[in-house]
UniProtKB/Swiss-Prot annotation:
UniProt keyword annotation of Cytoplasm present: yes
Family matches, as InterPro entries: RdgC (IPR007476)
One of the GO BP terms on file: DNA recombination
Gene: rdgC
Keywords in alphabetical order: Cytoplasm, DNA recombination
Family to which this protein belongs: Belongs to the RdgC family.
Name of the featured protein: Recombination-associated protein RdgC
Subcellular location: Cytoplasm, Nucleoid
Domain of life of the source: Bacteria
Length: 302
């Protein structure tokens, strides 16, 4: 199961409805295929469930997809060295300087020669569509990685009107008040890690193994710094770092959560996957609702 390690939440700005069989047909049109000897990169959909031919997993109005990107690794310095050597040999042989187009052609030949021997890097990105709430969750640690997968889904479906979720209150201000005014929600425990930032001077302080209720931290907040990253623990659920843009990083589900379905035999992969997906999505739905409450509700963009 793809237990999310990072969470970026997007809101659908127009209602989206999906039907399993038609979605599968669309996904199959963009199915991942490995790089051939002449490909630098390939991007498409892979099956979320090991051993299944289906390119999506669904429970009611909940859909899980997994994008698969393969990139051939060709070190730029290797290409540069080989290209320069070939150019030097040819220029000496012909007693003239090569044109820009000729140099590019040589570089292209070098890349074509090296590609079949290049190693591949594979990247899998899970995306969960909660169509009950009209929200999209992406397991990505960067906006670019999330946007790449959303762009693939947009191309697959023909349309995908989404924006990053935003709230009436700024998360950085709310997190700052949790520490400065002792307004931490009773369901949440602060861990000893945070990032404080001054928006006036761009100065940044990163704290680890630091009591966030100490006088030292209080002085930084009084001086006008805001909390932009905060390590938190939702007891018996999961821990994570909550960021100023309401994204979550380093999500780690509690053992109590991950062990709930241990009564299902490991051999029954499909049943365990189904149960774990339900478990994870319910946890993230609950946390999203708590964020909505703490941050004053979802902000509707014009």
């Amino acid at each position: 199961m793809f237990w999310f390690k990072n969470v970026m939440i997007y809101r659908l700005t127009s209602p989206l409805s999906l039907e399993s069989s038609s979605l599968e047909e669309q996904l199959q049109q963009a199915k991942f295929t490995p790089c051939s000897q002449s490909d630098m990169s390939k991007f498409g959909w892979s099956s979320p469930l090991s051993g299944s031919e289906l390119l999506h997993f669904s429970q009611g109005k909940q859909f899980l997809l997994v994008s698969h990107k393969e990139d051939k690794l060709l070190p730029a310095n290797v290409i540069k060295k080989e290209t320069e050597e070939r150019i030097a040999v040819l220029e000496e042989k012909e007693a003239r300087k090569l044109k820009k187009t000729e140099k590019q052609a040589i570089k292209d030949d070098v890349v074509a020669m090296l590609l079949p021997r290049a190693f591949s890097k594979h990247q899998f990105t899970a995306i969960w569509l909660d169509l009950d709430a009209q929200l999209v969750y992406v397991d990505a640690g960067s906006s670019k990685r999330a946007e790449d997968t959303l762009a693939l889904l947009r191309k697959t479906l023909g349309s995908l009107p989404v924006v990053p979720i935003s709230f009436a209150l700024l998360p950085s201000e709310v997190m700052t008040n949790w520490i400065a005014k002792g307004h931490t929600p009773n369901w949440l425990n602060l861990l000893e890690e945070a990032e404080l930032k001054s928006f006036d001077t761009d100065s940044v302080i990163r704290c680890k193994r630091q009591d966030l209720e100490s006088e030292e931290i209080a002085q930084h907040l009084q001086a006008g710094k805001f909390v932009t990253k905060l390590a938190i623990d939702w007891e018996n659920h999961f821990s994570c770092v909550l960021n100023e843009d309401a994204t979550l990083s380093r999500v780690k589900f509690a053992d109590e959560v991950r062990e709930k379905n241990d009564d299902i035999l490991k051999e029954d992969i499909a049943q365990r996957f189904d149960a774990d997906f339900l478990l994870m999505t319910e946890e993230l739905k609950l946390f999203t609702q708590k964020m909505i409450e703490e941050f004053g509700g979802i902000k509707e963009r014009i």
